Amino acid sequence: MDGGCIGVICDTVGRAQHAAELLGNHCGRDCVRLTHSRFMDIDRMSNERELRDLLGPDATIGNGKRPGKLVVVGTQVLEQSLDIDFDALETDIAPDDLIMQRLGRVHRHRRGDGECDRPVSLQTATFYIRGVEAWNKEGPKFSRGADSVYDAAALMESLAVLDLTAAGASCAQQLPQDIARTVRSAYGNDPHGFLPHMWLPQYDDA
């Protein structure tokens, strides 16, 4: 990791703890923070206050408040009401409306002209989705724990509406313009109309 403030949102506490341990070993434990719903309220509130101080709108590289290198690993608490801003984000697969909400934590605040205060490689908002263990022709096999919180059918809809239907697939979203359109596509149409045909038996059984 060359620098930047990266968020990692996991669907379960166990996945968050595991990710934080791996990242701590790779990046250095001083660069990794963990927050999730099992923290005692007083500890979680203190943690969230520190995150706002480090990653909120008033924290900049110029005033020395925004760190040059930080990874924040958490559960859904990171998508809820925290006014924080990441240079890039990786998230477990989730229903489409939550994916859009999480995406709103990336480049939430302007960081210099043309985002010049961000690392060069992260000046374009970048968002990674994980939680698919295998891409089978009949549908995705979700990683253990990734489908324990949300219905597998909703996760398949989320991937399909974003056109992420194969390993290495990517899509581009314009925020906030695309949020309403993407959510409407996921919830306002018959999923059989946008899901890959080969996924339909697995989807109907989910």
Q: Language model features by range: what are they?
A:
Residues 63-79, 91:
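Conserved two-lobed SF2 helicase motor
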Residues 83:
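Flexible glycine/serine/alanine-rich "lid" or loop that lines and gates the nucleotide-sugar donor pocket
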Residues 1-9, 14, 18-53, 58-62, ...:
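C-terminal helicase lobe and adjacent C-terminal extensions/tails of nucleic-acid helicase motors
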